[in-house]
Regions:
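Membrane-targeting and insertion segments and their boundary/processing signals
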Residues: 22, 42-46, 149
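Local cysteine-cluster metal-coordination motifs and their immediate loop/turn environment
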Residues: 40-55
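Structural motif
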Residues: 34-36, 48, 124
């Protein structure tokens, strides 16, 4: 890795540690009777210049979020009923930016998941926190209180000029603080 990718010893050690952790998690998956659940939240603080995902700026769609969650809850009930006999291995709430939801909405969604599915075989429950400008202490507390095992923060870049150009309304410092 050092020669091919010009990676530092520190980054090489980090990559190896992550690979070992992931290998341990993957070895626990039940590939025959298990499944993973992806839940999409299509709202973001703003639309990034490069983004190809289906997402909507929250400012324009805020009054539709609860209706979206109502529909999502019905879909979760359907999926849970269809898969009751299978082992739920992992859950990923992605987007968009799920942490654009208000704390009570995020809590509502996670509680619905916890009530609808058997999580006894779930080895990882991830919420994409995507953008540091959407993370608050209250939202982090909701995630902790609901047993979320992993969050994903994706700044896209650590160069402020690039963040500004691509439409990310957060700073490099906010990413570090997150």
């Amino acid at each position: 890795m050092k020669k091919t990718y010009l990676a530092s010893d520190e980054k090489i050690d980090l990559s190896i540690a992550i690979a070992e952790r992931e290998r341990a998690l993957l070895s626990k998956l039940d590939y025959k009777k298990g499944y993973s659940l992806y839940i999409g939240i299509p709202f973001c603080p703003s639309t990034c210049l490069y983004c190809s995902f289906t997402s909507y700026p929250l400012a324009s769609w805020r009054n539709q979020v609860d209706a979206y969650l109502d529909a999502l809850e019905r879909e979760l009930d359907y999926v849970a009923a269809k898969n009751y006999h299978r082992k739920l291995n992992s859950i990923y709430i992605g987007g968009g930016t799920p942490t654009t939801l208000e704390p009570y909405q995020l809590d509502r969604l996670i509680r619905k998941i916890r009530c609808s599915f058997d999580l006894s075989h779930c080895i990882e429950f991830t919420v994409e926190a995507g953008r540091p400008d959407s993370i608050t202490k209250e939202k982090l507390q909701v995630l902790r209180n609901n047993g979320i095992s992993r969050i994903s923060i994706n700044p896209q870049t650590m160069k402020q000029e690039t963040l500004d150009i691509i439409g990310r309304h957060h700073t490099v410092d906010q990413t570090i603080e997150s």
